[in-house]
Structures are given as structure tokens and as C-alpha cells.
Amino acid sequence: MSIPSILRKETLKKKDKNIDLQENNINDLVVSASRVIAPLWPISTFAAHHPWMGLEKQSFEQVANWLKEARNVDIYPSASMIHSAKAKGEIEESFLQIALSRWLDSQSFHMPRETAERFCQEALKLERLPSSLLSSPELNKLAEEINYVNTGSMKDSSMQPISSLIENQNGDNLSDILNYHIIKWCKLYLDDAGASWAMPNREKGFYRAWQHLITFDPSLSKTERKVLKDWPEDALIALTKALSELGISESNMQAYLEGHLLSLPGWAGMIRWRSQQSIEEQELLIEYLAVRLSMELAIVKPYLPLKNQKVEKKVSIVPLIASWIYWGDISIEKWLQMSAAEQSELLAFAYRFDENTRKKLWLEAWEQTHAEQLREKIASKQRATHDKKRVVAQLAFCIDVRSEPFRRHLEKLGPFETFGIAGFFGLPIATTELGSNDSHPSLPVILKPKHQIKELTDENECKSYEQRKMVGSSVRYTFKTMKQNVLTSMLLPEVSGPLLGLQMVTRSFVPRRVGGFIRNLRKNMLQKPDTTFSLNHVHDTNCEIPIGFTKEEKVNYVRQALKMVGLTEGFAPLVVMCGHSSQSTNNPYAAALECGACGGAAGGFNARVFATLCNLPEVREALSAEGIKIPDDTIFAAAEHKTTVDELEWIYVPELSETAQEAFDCIEAIMPNVSQHANRERLMQLPHFKTKIKNPSKEAHRFAEDWSEIRPEWGLARNASFIIGQRELTRDCDLEGRAFLHNYDWKQDESGDILANIIAGPGTVAQWINLQYYASTVAPHYYGSGNKTTQTVTAGLGVMQGNASDLLPGLPWQSVMQSDRETYHSPLRLLIVIQAPTKYIERLLNNNFTFREKVQNKWVRLASVDPEGRWKNW
């Protein structure tokens, strides 16, 4: 099967290759080709993303087949994962049979249905064909005799870089040599870690900086340097020239560029992300491709022109015949007795029912089993009757799956009501903490901040605090400078050895006590003063975005968030906005455990800002005029849910009313018990704990402080569903920490705008998280990041395996695997469940083309629960 570029522009017309391309044509081709890679955020602000976000106009199946053909990357679960899931009861056989029947109904074939079904049933066992059968002389002789049969499939190498088709005299593939050079130059240019010797001319851009140095690179041969000596100074011209001299026709250029981007998707993804951050680097992806293809030309030029550069071959029919012999019980003798038409029919059918198709049916059965189990769980709780108990406090948590067990235990142990909302609380802000000049976009990465909020305090207090911070910063700076200096680096071990040695021993043997001691020591030394926020609107010419909010904006953001979760009446005396954060030591992936809705940062800042806005008299008066009446004795507070230790840390508690104080005391009284239950449930899922845990909270703190711990928590592993509805829908349901939960009351959303906003914002973030975990599980060698213990943090950007690998884009092995042989994360596409009438879902799909496309192309699954409790799969 000839596989063209899946994003090839339909309007691209073939031209004579001697005609020069216009610059905008190359620009357009690079933009189109870039969709095969996803932007990669730096690991310090690790943002969940899924690697196929630019390919959603194609179906999941099309992309899976294309990746298998183009890169030999399999994005369906492996046979071992499927067998393990079936053994654990996660896949119902009946759903597999339904999926198979549906597939057979969609096919056209001229053989008895029973024959086709028998073949498929055996093939679905996912057993490998015996190597003895595939190498059998009789089978290969038969294949030669009937090789006239055309399955309609051709191999097309136009996607592959020319360097991948050539080996040098040492047997090294030239693409590996090219990748080695590109990795080296990317590390030099992108280094944000403050290397002592920065890349010269870096300010002129990647291509120009590379060009100034490349002719002095001793790792290149004299011939290779000569090719690049008089190379064009403009990146776009250089890229065009390289494509021309490599002999790439215009009709194949986009596919060729895609092949190069997919060769190092991590580094290319980081380049793409950087190109989106500033006007100065907006051409960075073109520069990257110019460097890469220029170097490829220099390396492969002695081998050009290639003979049979583009080779088309028929797919071998040996495995197709073998599959009918092994699974269809058709012997070689029977094959010889068939007519050519009968042989062709069998081979074409076996080709269509290939490994990807078989795994696709298994995945659909797995997902349908999960959906049915979730439906039954929700339905059983709906049938149960609940006594309406008095609520003394309401707590709003992030939709993060780690909040679900904590919320469940909290509601079970006390008179509380919980809500789910995106952890940035609808505030499109960039935050600046006290004593810092840097701001952090504290919102989902798909959005841009509109306001800057600064943490403020008394001027004298601020200066004193900054001085204390500077002491610690100076020590770190001095240590780093000595470490990077040629002379002082030899003295540093003598000076710091005793102290660091003591730290190593104590951190290793008593991590919880030492970690707590260091944390408290740092806190006592800094003595951070009480702070407020710059909430009032100020236009600062030094800031790209305004500081603070206008009165209308304050009211609008509070109203929007309260309506989004359906909290417009029945306010409890105490309403707590709970952001969340994680706590771990020596963990490059710390940001991956923070709040995804806050751009890989803790959510406490947003929670505190929102709670402060809710307590402002001017905001309450305006809301009251609109019908949202917050009682005078209702107080909003803010806290932070520490997901690694399942504790609630108060970060903003204003003066409380009498009833609010009672609610606060009630929360404080039961919180140790909630933490014990939540920690026990969570720790029992970790590989080390299969027996009873005496003190779960103590163990959780040890995990958080132990710098040798490679798995302080599971993060968002096993996430599988996103439930949008009232809390009554899932109250008392043990969702096993697998569901994102967002409150939604369709009765307060006549226009459907609230639902549309949930789908566009939190829904997209949840989908990205889900598919990142999915990709890191099914294809860890390509989309994951390998073993944590052998990773190298490089250039302040991300991790590599060793010092010359791709920049690894996904999650580490420890985030998704239970052991070397068994996965922990179940690779299922996200199931979005919406509690609303059918007409609401129909309107959503009709009005939101992007979401409809995701559902139709099976990037997400969709179900709904109507007001009568009826479940519908869409």
C-alpha cells in the first residue's frame, strides 16, 4: 500500500524539480509537516500533551496504520497487555465478539461466513505464527508459485530520510550518525541551564550559530566540511537547496520533511515549542530542518545518486498463506487445489485482518467493558436512596483523578459536599510570587494569561525576605560556579564533601526525618511574611498583560466558576477552594505530578486568589444583584491538597464567622482520619505494598522525602474517564482514582455554553493527559522516556538516555508499569460521560466541530446519562 503523507495538501501540484520553489511554498510545507510532531514543553513546566494532537483530522485507526508503516511504531496495546487485561477481568469476551461481527459486516468477501469467522477467531488469540512454518521450504515454494496475487499493498520509502537507507563501510547507518550530530547541536543551542561556555552567536539564531561553527567541527570529515563551507547564510534558501541536491521532488517534499521530524520527535518537538514562544524564534523549525538536511547532504553526498532510491515492493505473501494454514486449517495441498481467484480472495482477507485490525478489536472490547462496568457502578448508586444530610462545609477540588479518593473519604467521614472544577478555577493569570521577578502562566497550556497577579507585602518585610532568599541563592550560585569552573571544580569535593556525605547518609537511611528537618529549617530561615495580592487593575507599561482585574472582571470570573460547578445557591458556612500540589525529592518529573490545569505548577496560588475574590464585598454585592446570593456568614478559604501524602494544607484562612469556624474545626478534626484512609488506598496500589500498612501517612511521607524513591506516587496513571455532572451521580461510587470529575448542572445551562467551555478547556486537558499516558504505555521506546534510574537531565530542558539520545517526550517507565512484565496503566482512550438530556449532547456535537471530529475519529469516547438515568453511547 503506497502511504502518502497523511497531511499532504490536496492542492499541491507536481512541478518540474528544476523549477525553484518560492519561499512561502517551503514555509507552508514545513507548517503542514510539523503537525506530525507535538510541541514538547521543558520538563520544569511539564505540560501534559498527546503526541498526535496535529493528526486528529484522521481517524485513530488511520494514524495507527500510518505509524506502523512509516516508523514501525505500534500504538495499539500489545498482545501481552491484552492477555493480562483479559485475565484480570477487564475485557469481556462478548464485547470482542460484537466488535468482530461488526467488522465482518463491514467487509466484502466471497467465502462462507463460517470460514471467515473461524479464521478470525483463531487469529484473535494473538499467537505468533511459528517461525518453523514461516521458514518452511514447502510454504516458500508455494508463495513463489502464486506470487502473481496482488494484495494491493506496496511499500513506499519516500517517507524515509535518504540517510536511513545507507550504511557506511563500518556497517553504521548514516541516519544514526546524522542524529548524533543533530542532538549535539540542539543541546548546544537550546541549553537553558546556564552553561559556562554558551554557544557562540546564539543570539543570531540556530542556523547562523551552527553555520559559524560547523566548518570547524572535528567530528566531520574534510569532505563533509567542504560541502558546508560555502553553504547559504539564509536557512530557508539552505533548506531549499538541500532538498534539491538530495533529489527530493516537490510532490514528496512534505513527506520527506515529516520523516526527518519523526526521526527525533523529542528534539523536534522542543524546537517547535520554542518557535511558538517568541517572535524572534518563530522560524526556528525551519532553521532546525535546514541544519538537519544540510548535514544530511554533507554526510550522504559521496553515496549519491542512490540506485533505486524509491523502491516499491509487494508485501510478502508468505505470512498471509501461513496465517491461513495455522489459523484457517487450510493445508498446502488445499492451496494448490484452489483457483487463482480463490487464492487471491483468501490472501486479501488475511491482509485486511492484519495485526493492527485484531488489536483494534481487542482495544474496542476493552474500552466497551470499562464503559459497561462504569455504567453499572453509577446505576447501582443511583438506585440506592440517600438521606440528605446537613452540609457544614463545601470543598472544591481540581478534576485531577487523584482528588477522587480523597473526596470520597472526606464525604464519607464528615458532613461535607465536594465539587470538581479545573484547578486554575477559571482564572487566566500569570503568577509572580513574593521576592521573584519571574512570572509563571498558571493556567492550562492551551490558554494564554490575560492578567498578572503579584504577591505583595509590606515594603520593609519584602526587602528583609528578599535578603534572606538571596543568602540561599548565593550559596547555590557559588556552588554551581565552582562546579563549572575548571580550577575550582577540583577543590569543590574537598570543601563540600563532608557536608554532602553526611546529607547522603542521612537522606538515605532516615529520609522522612531529615527531609522534614530540612523543610522546616528552610521555612524558618525564610520566614515568609503574610502576603496579599495585586487584585486591582493597574496598567504597567513594563508588563505585556495588565496587573490585576477590573471590578467587572472580578465579578465575571467568580460568577463563571460558580455557575460552571452549579454552586449558585445553598452555600455552606465555609467554602474551601482546594488547589493541589505534589511533594517529592530528587525528581526531574516533579512538575508532571503538579496541577496540569496550572501549567505544571501547584494550584494553591489560584485557589487563594479565587477565594479572596469571593470574599470581596464589591463582588458579593454585584453577584447578589444577579441572583447569586452568598450569605454574610459564608466565608471562602483556600487550601492545597498534597497528593503525595494526601493532606490538606491551609494557605488562606480569613477571619471566620462562628458557623464557619465550627466547620473549619470539623474539617481539622477528621482530616488525619481522611489522610490515613486515602493514603492506605493509594499505597496499596504501589508495587512494594501488598500487605497491611500499619501507618499509611508515615509511609507516604517517607516516599515523599526519600531521594532514592523512583515512584513517590502513581500520578494520573489508570485515568480512563471524565465525568461531567452533579456530584449525586457519582457520590459513594468507588471510582478507584480513575475518573476526572467535573461538576455540571445542565438545568443552569440552557444555552449549552457552560458545557461547551468544559469540553473545550478541562475536557481537552483531560484528553491530552489520557493520551500521553496511553502513548507512554503502548510505545514506551518511542513516546515514553525509559527508566528513571538511567536518565540524564540535559540542558535544563528534559531527559535523555545517556548523552546522545532523543529528548524523551513522554512519561518514564515507573509512571505506567507495575513491573518489567506488567503494566499498571490501562491504555484506554478517554471516556467522556456527560449528565444532560440527549438534546444537549446533540447540540454540543452540532456546534463544536473539533469535538465532533475527535469523537467520530475515535480519539475520545462519548457517553451520556439523561435525567432519568438512561445511559447512551455515542
From Swiss-Prot:
Topological category with respect to the lipid bilayer: Peripheral membrane protein
Sequence intervals crossing the membrane: none
Compartments, record wording: Cell membrane
InterPro entries documented for this protein: DabA
A molecular function (GO) term: zinc ion binding
Main location per the UniProt record: membrane
Pfam families in the record: DabA
GO cellular component: plasma membrane
Annotated Zn(2+) binding sites: 398, 400, 580, 595
Statement: the UniProt record of this protein carries the keyword Manganese: no
Cofactor(s) the protein needs: Zn(2+)
Keyword tags: Cell membrane, Membrane, Metal-binding, Transport, Zinc
Keyword presence, Acyltransferase: no
Family recorded in the similarity comment: Belongs to the inorganic carbon transporter (TC 9.A.2) DabA family.
Complex formation: Forms a complex with DabB.
Function: Part of an energy-coupled inorganic carbon pump.
Record-given protein name: Probable inorganic carbon transporter subunit DabA
